Amino acid sequence: MFYSIVAIFVGAGFGAVLRWFLALALNEFFPAVPLGTLAANLIGGYVIGVAAVVFTARVGLPPEWRLFVITGFLGGLTTFSTYSVEVMTHAVQGEFGWAIAVAALHLTGSFTLTALGMWTARAWFAAA
């Protein structure tokens, strides 16, 4: 139990710091669509796709690795709450086009990159 908690704690810290760096580096470029939040969610979508295949195919990996990557790192990196407030801020301000665009970018982008991550990992295993 202790190692599981440590794995989640450390992974979440790395993920949250990466999300913060992405926000610092990217959000200023296009305020209508905070690119740091979008990048965090898209990266998270790709990584979860890869991780889903890897952790299913490599059943011998210690469970702490799954907790570190999926629960910790990706839990700290990706952000549904920030995405939600960004969409709702546009909606409350009457910017419904932007609200729909931001929502669509996050949802379609994340699903697409999750599928791409799964495809990539399957291709790696097929080639090995």
Swiss-Prot record:
Annotated Gene Ontology cellular component terms: plasma membrane
Taxonomic superkingdom: Bacteria
Any Gene Ontology biological process: cellular detoxification of fluoride
Localisation per UniProt entry: Cell inner membrane
UniProt cross-references to Pfam families, sorted A to Z: CRCB
GO function terms (MF aspect): fluoride channel activity; metal ion binding
Residues annotated to bind Na(+): G75, T78
Transmembrane intervals: 5-25, 35-55, 67-87, 96-116
Activity: how regulated: Na(+) is not transported, but it plays an essential structural role and its presence is essential for fluoride channel function.
Keyword terms: Cell inner membrane, Cell membrane, Ion channel, Ion transport, Membrane, Metal-binding, Sodium, Transmembrane, Transmembrane helix, Transport
Record flagged with keyword Nucleotide-binding: no
Bilayer topology term: Multi-pass membrane protein
Reactions this protein catalyses: fluoride(in) = fluoride(out)
Function (record text): Fluoride-specific ion channel. Important for reducing fluoride concentration in the cell, thus reducing its toxicity.
NCBIfam families: crcB, PRK14196.1
Protein family per UniProt: Belongs to the fluoride channel Fluc/FEX (TC 1.A.43) family.
Record's protein name: Fluoride-specific ion channel FluC
